[in-house]
């Protein structure tokens, strides 16, 4: 399926971004299929230079922030090999294939999939404490602002889900859009850092998964990495099974999960190792950021909780205000522009809803909106911006969500 002529065209993974205007850049696209090992090898071969660029960046970032060598980081990541193998052996096989295809070590790929867990691991904080025994200052949670809009919040009657994915600018050129064909499981479309097996996206069953880091350190019992949990959620064929994964799985770190389905339903779960909180939309609109909105977990409240990303307190209401205009939309084209405009808000710049690098910080600590995504769960179209949405048009991906298992007659809307 070719991209619409009015949209940015996709480029193969591993290609250099276009020179000149950065707004003309498109995200690389990768499609994989076959057995888990075959899928992994296809993926690794396609993103080989991007994966090695990501490894180089995180080696520098961990070295600068914690004084750790990459060997120590992978040694920490090895803690997750056994639990992931027990929970999802097919994903370990996929990671093994990625490593083979990219010419990397399995623990390198595992570290990329557990980078958040390494950062927020309680024992990691202890081994990186200074000589006085003080742990390092907790890093801000992975920044994102997610939304779901349907029913009275959507003037054209479509079901929308998406987010601004804010993370370190140094990995911007390692982000790819991946389509995973894995029957009988649903086909997935996700935005990921090269080598990751899961992050955020949507599937052919009409389920969208958007996520936000929440921060806070809990106990040091081993839980599953977010990439594995999120991939498992998107592997489900209905909303109840997707929720079941989140409620029955103990993740290692806290993360917010916003689930939206094509039937016109959404629920938000603030998942933590200590328990979950949940929220429902108000009049069809739900927005979540990087602070606890359903309730602060008791262990964090007892310790005097303060949001690790104070700008989230601004981003959430600004997104709500901007997306309120969607209820008056008369058609999908207008809706998409209203959403892009809402997600381009700059109040509090540079740490705004549309995030830009802060020139006051060292380059390795620069944050930016890596991708602004929009899934139309009514039509199955998936749109993204390759960077900040304020100065870019949506890139129309060359796939439809409903070209896969569970995407047949029960899907709402029509396929383009």
Describe each region flagged by the PLM.
Residues 229-235:
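Short, well-ordered beta-strand elements within core beta-sheets of diverse protein domains
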Residues 115-228, 370, 382-384, 391-392:
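Internal mixed beta-strand/loop scaffold within catalytic domains of large alpha/beta enzymes
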């Amino acid at each position: 399926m070719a991209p619409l002529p009015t949209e940015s065209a996709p480029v193969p993974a591993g290609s250099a971004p276009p020179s000149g205007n950065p707004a003309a850049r498109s995200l690389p696209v990768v499609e994989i299929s076959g057995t888990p090992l075959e899928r992994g090898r296809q993926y690794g071969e396609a993103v080989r230079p991007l994966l090695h660029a990501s490894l180089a960046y995180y080696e520098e970032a961990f070295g600068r922030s914690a004084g750790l060598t990459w060997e120590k980081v992978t040694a920490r990541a090895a803690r997750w090999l056994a639990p992931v193998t027990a929970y999802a052996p097919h994903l370990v096989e996929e990671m093994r294939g990625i490593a083979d295809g990219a010419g990397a070590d399995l623990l390198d790929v595992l570290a990329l999939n557990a980078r958040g867990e390494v950062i927020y691991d309680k024992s990691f904080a202890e081994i990186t404490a200074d000589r006085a025994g003080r742990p390092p200052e907790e890093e801000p949670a992975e920044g994102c602002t997610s939304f779901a809009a349907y029913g009275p919040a959507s003037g054209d009657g479509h079901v929308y889900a998406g987010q601004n994915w804010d993370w370190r600018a140094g990995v911007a050129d390692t982000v790819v859009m991946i389509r995973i064909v894995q029957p009988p499981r649903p086909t997935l479309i996700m935005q990921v850092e090269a080598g990751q097996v899961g992050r955020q996206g949507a599937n052919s069953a009409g389920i969208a998964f958007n996520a936000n880091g929440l921060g806070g350190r809990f106990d040091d019992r081993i839980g599953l990495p977010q990439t594995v949990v999120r991939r498992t959620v998107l592997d489900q064929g209905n909303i109840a099974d997707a929720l079941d994964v989140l409620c029955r799985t103990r993740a290692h770190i806290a993360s917010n999960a916003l689930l939206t389905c094509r039937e016109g339903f959404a629920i938000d779960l603030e998942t933590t190792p200590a328990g979950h909180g949940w929220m429902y939309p108000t009049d069809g609109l739900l927005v979540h950021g990087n602070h606890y909105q359903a309730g602060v977990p008791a262990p964090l409240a007892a310790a005097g909780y303060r949001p690790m990303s104070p700008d989230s307190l601004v981003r959430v209401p600004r997104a709500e205000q901007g997306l309120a205009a969607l209820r008056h939309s008369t058609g999908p084209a207008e809706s998409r522009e209203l959403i892009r405009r809402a997600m381009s808000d700059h109040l509090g710049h540079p740490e705004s809803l549309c995030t830009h690098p802060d020139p006051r910080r060292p380059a390795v600590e620069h944050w930016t909106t890596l991708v602004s995504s929009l899934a139309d769960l009514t039509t199955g179209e998936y749109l993204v911006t390759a960077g900040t949405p304020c100065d870019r048009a949506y890139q129309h991906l060359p796939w439809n969500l409903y070209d896969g298992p569970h995407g047949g007659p029960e899907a709402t809307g029509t396929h383009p």
